């Protein structure tokens, strides 16, 4: 498993490219080390509940050298190896904290300020001069009001068919904090162009059920209940089970092939031994035949010499 930086918003991993760039990884001090609290406090990362500071249970938590200042390292040896000093603490986390605050600001809707309320009030007052008296404008509800109540989520067919149907200036709705800027632009457009008397507003027709209503009832993804302390996620358990079964089947097949190869090797060894024995017997028979022939030749030579004498 490759090492990676556990700081919020940092995606640096221990690869060949990062090592060539001179980026090193340093492990979080153990729980009995007083510097551990400083490291966790400076990284400004919250626990999964979002209440306190992040205190991981794993012993393999690393921070890359981009979060340390230059004076936190020292040169060691002739090769120029940069080693982290004993009392070094990571302090460079500003950019990642700003990024996290920006994403949080985008994800929540806050009530408009006094300047926006006064601008919307003046715009609605100019538009109401041509329509008649209206009820006084009320500011949008506070941010703690839920934007999507259960009644609207259970009956999506009652939503308007198009965003053209705007709310009245005096009415307050849970969607007013989301439709505030859009409603102001639509009111300005309505002030510039008066509606013709021939065009009558058509009754709202029920729209088809959006697929998002069914997406809310889908089960969570596999491994969603597992607490993630790292930037990677555990895959599907069913997928890993299938991979394990496929690996076991491949291992069983390889073992059967190995046993068959061993039996074939044993048969070949026995056949080779028999051939060697037959070859040795043939050599001994040839040697005996030569010796017998030599003896016969010597006897014939002796008989021939004795007969000539």
Swiss-Prot record:
Record-level GO BP terms: chromatin organization; negative regulation of DNA-templated transcription; negative regulation of transcription by RNA polymerase II; regulation of DNA-templated transcription
MF terms (GO), sorted A to Z: C2H2 zinc finger domain binding; DNA binding; general transcription initiation factor binding; histone deacetylase binding; histone H4 reader activity; histone reader activity; identical protein binding; transcription corepressor binding
Modified residues (Phosphoserine): 162, 210
Key word DNA repair present: no
Pro residues compositional bias, start-end: 198-209
Motif (HCFC1-binding motif (HBM)): 229-232
Residue segments, region Disordered: 158-209
Keyword annotations: Chromosome, DNA-binding, Metal-binding, Nucleus, Phosphoprotein, Transcription, Transcription regulation, Zinc, Zinc-finger
Tagged with keyword Metal-binding: yes
InterPro entries for the chain: THAP7, THAP_Znf
Mapped zinc finger ranges (THAP-type): 1-93
Cellular component GO terms, alphabetical: chromatin; intracellular membrane-bounded organelle; nuclear membrane; nuclear speck; nucleoplasm; nucleus
One Pfam entry name: THAP
Localization, UniProt: Nucleus; Chromosome
Principal location listed in the UniProt entry: nucleus
Main function: Chromatin-associated, histone tail-binding protein that represses transcription via recruitment of HDAC3 and nuclear hormone receptor corepressors.
Subunit structure comment from the entry: Forms homodimers. Interacts with HDAC3 and nuclear hormone receptor corepressors. Interacts via HBM with HCFC1.
Protein's name according to its UniProt entry: THAP domain-containing protein 7
Organism, scientific name: Homo sapiens (Human)
Gene for this chain: THAP7
């Amino acid at each position: 498993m490759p090492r990676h930086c556990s700081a919020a918003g940092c995606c640096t991993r221990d690869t060949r490219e990062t090592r060539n760039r001179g980026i090193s990884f340093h492990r979080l001090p153990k729980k009995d080390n007083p510097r551990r609290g400083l490291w966790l406090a400076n990284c400004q990362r919250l626990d999964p509940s979002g209440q306190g500071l992040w205190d991981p249970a794993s012993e393999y938590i690393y921070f890359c050298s981009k979060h340390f200042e230059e004076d936190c390292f020292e040169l060691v040896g002739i090769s120029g190896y940069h080693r982290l000093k004993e009392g070094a603490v990571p302090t460079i986390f500003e950019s990642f904290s700003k990024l996290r605050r920006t994403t949080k600001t985008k994800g929540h809707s806050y009530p408009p300020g006094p300047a926006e309320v006064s601008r919307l009030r003046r715009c609605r007052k100019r538009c109401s001069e041509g329509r008649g008296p209206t009820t006084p404008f009320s500011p949008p509800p506070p941010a703690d009001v839920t934007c999507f109540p259960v009644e609207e989520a259970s009956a999506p067919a009652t939503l308007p068919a198009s965003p053209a149907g705007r709310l009245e200036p005096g009415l307050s709705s849970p969607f007013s904090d989301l439709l505030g800027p859009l409603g102001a632009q639509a009111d300005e457009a309505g002030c510039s162009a008066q509606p013709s008397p021939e065009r009558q507003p058509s009754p709202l027709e029920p729209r088809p059920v959006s697929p998002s209503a069914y997406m809310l009832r889908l089960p969570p993804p596999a491994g969603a209940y597992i607490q993630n302390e790292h930037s990677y996620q555990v895959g599907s358990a069913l997928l890993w089970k299938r991979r394990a079964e496929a690996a076991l089947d491949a291992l069983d097949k390889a073992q059967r092939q190995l046993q068959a190869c061993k039996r074939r090797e044993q048969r070949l060894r026995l056949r080779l031994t028999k051939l060697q024995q037959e070859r040795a017997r043939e050599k001994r028979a040839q040697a005996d035949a030569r010796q017998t022939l030599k003896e016969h030749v010597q006897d014939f030579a002796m008989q021939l010499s004795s007969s000539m004498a």
